[in-house]
C-alpha cells in the first residue's frame, strides 16, 4: 500500500468495494467469496485473473487484505485498459480509469460504469455509489440511482421503444439504450421525470404495487416488459425509495449490486411477492427462446444434444459450476439432451442468473417442462437473438432481460470456457450429480442380474425344447437347453444351471423324459433326427439307413440290424411306445433307441431291466439325434461321452457293436456312435427318471453330445470289444448305467453349485467395487470442491 497512489475517487470506490466483499468485517476477504463474483464481473480471462491474484499476493496469502485488494483492483483497471499487466503499471499509467465490473444481469449498468470509469476521477461520487452491494436492500443506494439515472433515461426513454418493439434488432442498434433500460428497472424511477419512460421506470416499490402499469407499457413493447420487470426485481427495490443519489454513484451501485447476487436474490424474493412468479417465462421470452432453439434444432419436436447445448450455454460466460447446476435442473428427464421445454427452462435459468438471481435448488414449477407453454413460441422465428449473442450484448433478446444483452456481450468470451464444460458433469454443483452418474455407470449390478436371466433365456421352456433343439441341431453350439452341456463346459453350466434343473424336472414329470412330451408334438421329427444321428456317419439328414458299415464282421452285422432298427424307428416314430415293447426282445439296443423319444421307453425300463435298458439305449439314440445334432458340442462332451460309452458298452454289448460298425465307416460315424452313447446315457437317465431317478436322466443327455471324434473313436473301440459281450452282460450293466448317470448328474449338480457360488461371489464383489467407486468419486468431488474454494478462479 505504501507505493500505491490512489485518487480520492479511487480511494472511495475501492473502499466501498472492499467493504462489500468483506462480509464478515475481518479485514480479510476470502478468495472464493464475493471477490470471485467481482472479478467475474470484470470480464477478464481466467489466466489474467490468476495473474492478478498472483501479483497482488492474494494467492500466496490465501486471502485479500486491503492492500492486496486495492492492488488487485488497480491491476484490473490496468488489464481493462490494455496496458501490460505488471505491478509497475499501477503507478506508471496516468489517468487510469476505474475498474469496470459488468454484472451479467446488468450489462447496461456495466456500460454505465464504463462510461463513469472514463470520468472516474471526476466521479468522486463513485464511492457513494458503491456502498457495499449488500446494501442493495438499503434504501440509500436505491434512491441515489433513481435521480442519477433520470437524465440518461430521458434519452433512453425514447430509445426503449425501439428495442421493445423489435428487441432483437433494436438492441444491437441501440445497445446502450438497452443497457439503460435494464438499468432503469434497477433504478426504476430514473425515467419518471420523462413522461414516456415514467410508467416503465416507476420506482421499484411502485413497480410492485403498480407493476401492472409498467407491464402495460412494456406490453406495448412486448419483448422488454418481461425483461424490465424480471430484471428490475433486483435493482428496482432500492430505486423505489431512492431518488437523490448522483447518476454516477447509482450506476456504480448498480454494478456492485449486480455483483452481490446473493443479497439481491433475497430482496428479490421479498419484493417479488407482489409480482408474478419471477421464474415464469413471458410470451416474449418464450418466443426468443424458441427462436434460439430453432437456430440449433429446426425441429421443435426434436432435441438438442448435450454437446450442442454445452457450446450454446457456455457463451453465457457463467461459471462452470452454475452451468452444471442449470443443466441438472433443466435436463428434467436426465437423457443428456434438451427438448424445447427443457431448453427454455435452461435458457431462462441462465438469463436469471445473469441478472443476479440465485439459482433454485429445484426446478421451479413454472419451468417444469409440462408446465411451460411453448405453443406460441414455435411461431417466433425472426428474432436474431443468437446473432445477438455473437454480435452485441444488446442483441440478446430484449424480451429476455438485460441479462441477455450481457450474455451477448460475453458470448465470444464464453467460448473460452467451453473447454471447461467437460468438467461440467464432474464439477456439478453437488456431489449428488456424480453419484447419479455412478449409479448410471454402475449398472454392473443390473448387468449381473441380466446375466442370471441369460441362462434362463438360453434354456427354453419344455414347450419350446423340441423346436429349440431341432434348430440347434442345425447349429450345434447353441444347445443350452440340454443340461449335459453343462458338464462339458463350465460356462454353459452357469448359463444352464436353471435350464438343467428345469430340464431334468421336466423329464421326470413327463414320464421319465418330459422332453419327450415337448417332443411329442413332433415325434416324427425327433425320430428322424435320431436316425440322422445314427446315420450321421453318412451325414444324411433323412431317416435313411446309415451307409454300409466297414468290413468288420460283427460290427457290420450289428450295424445292419441297427440300420434296420433305425428304419423301423423312422417308420414308427409315431408308434414308438408300442414298437419299443416289441423291439426289445429282438434287438434291445436299436429298436428302443428309435422308440426312446416316446415315454414308452421309460415304461419298458420300469417293466423290466432288459426292456428298460434296451429302451434306454433306443431312448438314448433318439435323444442323441437331438443332441448329436450339436456336433459342435462334441469337443466339450467328448470326455463325458467316452465315459458313458464305456459304461454303455458294458451295459449294451450288442448296441456297442452296432455303433462300432458305424465308427469304422468314418469319423462321422464315430461321432454318431458317440451321440448314440450319449443318447444311451440320456435314455438311461430317463429310465431312472421314470424309476425315480429323473434328475439323472437330463444331465447325461447334453453331456454325451458329440464332442471329440478322436475320443469317441477310442471308446468305440472299447465298445466293439464290449459289444461282443452277450445280452446278459448288457442286462447286468443296466443297473450300472443309472449309477453312472447318477454320478454324472451329481458331478453336473456339483459343478452347477460351484458356478452358482462363484457367480454369487463375483456379483457381491462387483457390487462392493461399484460402491467403492462411488465413494471414491464422491471423495474426489469433495476434494475438487475444496480445491476450487482454495483456487476459485481455476474454473472461471
Swiss-Prot record:
Example GO CC term: the record gives:
cytosol
Chain intervals with Basic and acidic residues compositional bias: 671-681, 708-722
Compositionally biased residues, Pro residues: 544-554, 585-596
Enumerate the GO terms in the molecular function aspect: calcium ion binding; SH3 domain binding
**Record: disease:** Neurodegeneration with brain iron accumulation 7: A neurodegenerative disorder associated with iron accumulation, primarily in the basal ganglia. Clinical features include speech and motor delay, truncal hypotonia, progressive cerebellar ataxia, and loss of ambulation. NBIA7 transmission pattern is consistent with autosomal recessive inheritance.
Q: Which compartments does it reside in?
A: Membrane, Clathrin-coated pit
Which Pfam families would you find in this protein's record? EH (PF12763)
KW Transmembrane (keyword) present: no
Q: Which residues carry this modification: Phosphotyrosine?
A: 288
Residues of the region (Disordered) are 105-237, 377-433, 506-624, 638-725
Region: Interaction with RALBP1; residue ranges are 652-796
Q: Where does Ca(2+) bind?
A: 331, 333, 335, 342
One biological process GO term for this chain?
endosomal transport
Q: Which residues form a coiled coil?
A: 751-791
Which part of the chain is the EF-hand domain? 318-353
Q: How the protein assembles, per its UniProt entry?
A: Homodimer (Potential). Interacts with RAB11FIP2. Interacts with RALBP1, CRK and GRB2. Binding to RALBP1 does not affect its Ral-binding activity. Forms a complex with the SH3 domains of CRK and GRB2 which may link it to an EGF-responsive tyrosine kinase. Interacts with AMPH, ITSN1 (via SH3 domains) and SGIP1; may be involved in clathrin-mediated endocytosis.
Annotated Low complexity bias:
575-584
Establish whether keyword Transferase is in the entry.
Answer: no
Q: What is the name of the protein in this document? A: RalBP1-associated Eps domain-containing protein 1
From which source organism is this entry? Homo sapiens (Human)
